[in-house]
Design a protein with these regions (language model features):
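Short, low-complexity patches enriched in S/T/P/G
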Residues: 1-2, 20
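Hydrophobic membrane-insertion alpha-helices, especially the h-region
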Residues: 2-15
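Hydrophobic single-pass membrane-insertion segments
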Residues: 12-31
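N-terminal, intrinsically disordered, polar/charged segments of Gram-positive cell-envelope systems
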Residues: 26-46
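N-terminal "mature-domain start" segment
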Residues: 40-87, 144-145, 193-206
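Surface-exposed amphipathic alpha-helical segments
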Residues: 58, 62, 67-72, 117-133, ...
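Signature of long, low-cysteine stretches enriched in small and polar/charged residues
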Residues: 61, 65-91, 123-170
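A short acidic-to-branched-hydrophobic micro-motif
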Residues: 89-119, 176-177
């Protein structure tokens, strides 16, 4: 699996976060994003109320449960040689500061690296994710997802934001599940577990 592929997939996640207003995911500043409870706690500092939806993406090789109002984008990301790679991603924002996303892409035809060393591919994807989200590793667990090499990791940034991810290398395709939260208080462990454990690789266009 190409190192470039791992980098490209992280760029998609960062793209969605940075352009969430332009994409219509949240309202511009001053349009209600600072709603508070009666106790004065900002809406972004408490767990989102999530309604889940079972999603069958067999044509893309997977099934998963995600928060409702799922959207999809395809973002052109450019590799170090100037070539464009189209990366697919589905995502949902149950509140303005909480995001659940799945990105996937196949191995590029050129610039392959570490094709026979899954652990190195997952290491590179993890390290680049933390670099680009400006987070520091908190915990990490190697695992097997239906017999495929996978990796769970959790990271945080200086502002208290939490980034949870699961990387799955299924044959020649790399999947990345990501859940991001503005703070530890806004993160609910059972939501992350439900999201990650609902993901299944199925026969499709792999």
């Amino acid at each position: 699996m190409s190192i470039l592929l791992a980098v490209i997939m992280i760029l998609v996640v960062v793209y969605v976060y940075r352009h969430r207003v332009d994409l219509g995911i949240v309202s511009p500043a001053g349009k209600g994003n600072e709603e508070s409870t009666s106790s004065g706690i900002p809406a972004s500092a408490r767990p989102a109320n999530i309604a889940w939806e079972a999603l069958d993406r067999t044509s893309d090789g997977f099934k998963v449960e995600m928060p409702v109002e799922i959207k999809q984008i395809q973002v052109p990301a450019y590799n170090f040689q100037g070539g464009a790679e189209q990366v697919d991603m589905i995502y949902s924002y149950p509140n303005p500061e909480t995001c659940f996303a799945v990105a996937w892409a196949d191995e590029p035809p050129v610039e392959r690296a570490n094709s026979d060393v899954p652990d190195k591919t997952l290491d590179m994807a993890r390290d680049d994710a933390m670099q680009r989200t400006e987070t520091t590793l908190v915990s990490e667990t190697p695992l097997s997802q239906q017999g495929f090499p996978a990796r769970d990791f959790s990271a945080r940034n200086l502002g208290g934001g939490v980034f949870n991810a699961r990387l799955i290398l299924a044959r020649k395709r790399l999947y990345m599940l990501a859940a991001t939260f503005p703070s530890v208080d806004a993160r609910r462990e059972q939501d992350v577990i439900r999201f990650f454990n609902s993901f299944n690789v199925v026969a499709g266009n792999q």
